[in-house]
Amino acid sequence: MKTLIYSILILIGALSVAACANDVLPKPKGGLRLDYPQAAYSRVTDLPNCPFTFEANTLSAIEHKANSCDVNINYPTMKATIYLTYKNVDGNIRKLLTDAQNFTYKHTVKADNIAATTFVNDTTKVYGMFYQVYGNAASQSQFYATDSVKHFISGSIYFNVEPNYDSVQPASNYLQKDMRRIMETLRWK
């Protein structure tokens, strides 16, 4: 009987020792998953004395600066804003284009890359460039659009957080689609 008890105790002890082994397992890579609602757009026409209209995401809040045609498109849930700045073209198109391009390329200090895409819509006479900025730059996307004769508008995305590319990338990708939509739906009055 004693040997049976000793055998059971030895078996329990061996199982206890074997069960306490900590196998180190690699943790699977995880990524930040943020799901944003499907974008719905409506035409922004209530900008007094401004010679343009465009479509904006219905999730945004439009803030129009009095006595100017500057527009802030706020996204409170993402802590982001698309800033639109309008200028009249008065024989200064070259300066406006140079300023917009220089403004974008000032981000090269922090940016890993800047990809430029040409935008042309002959039907609506909207011509411009869209810039996607990669890396920890302050602005992840910028654009300008013009008719080359009377109108010039520029836009940029800024987040109200420290520019950590990995953290803002999901929201930035969502807002880049909105920014492209602004360019595509821009109409001069």
List the predicted regions and their residue ranges.
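Signature of long, low-cysteine stretches enriched in small and polar/charged residues
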Residues: 101-156
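C-terminal motif of bacterial Sec signal peptides marking the signal peptidase cleavage site
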Residues: 15-19
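Secretory pathway targeting signatures of secreted, lumenal, and periplasmic proteins
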Residues: 48-102
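Post-signal peptide N-terminal segment of mature Sec-exported envelope proteins
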Residues: 28-49
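Surface-exposed amphipathic alpha-helical segments
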Residues: 156-189
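Bacterial N-terminal signal peptides that target proteins for export
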Residues: 1-8
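Bacterial signal peptide processing site
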Residues: 21-25
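Second-shell loop/turn segments in exported
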Residues: 82-91, 142, 165-173
